[in-house]
């Protein structure tokens, strides 16, 4: 068995400035959910376990971690990617969605669009097993 990495993301709030100045996305237990998944990965002896909670769960930090993992992992390695927080929809600009909407993760400082996540995950080498729980 290869290397096993995990990235657990949990947001109890978002920065209202990134969401039209009013909405803070308050949720009660998303940080706890991410902490619990991280504990599971630790208990299963994952080689690397990263946890991004609320203010550290920024677009840059998530994209940077995924890029780091894409360079480090190879065939027969595993990535567990967990997200607990709000999701959203925005207008599809590249016309690849039948419903004309892209789905998003609402990160602390802005939304991460499904196309961006797909592009990041496409950087992993063939044979890396990626499990996304969202």
Give names to the regions the model predicted.
Residues 1-99, 127:
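Boundary/activation segment at the start of structured domains
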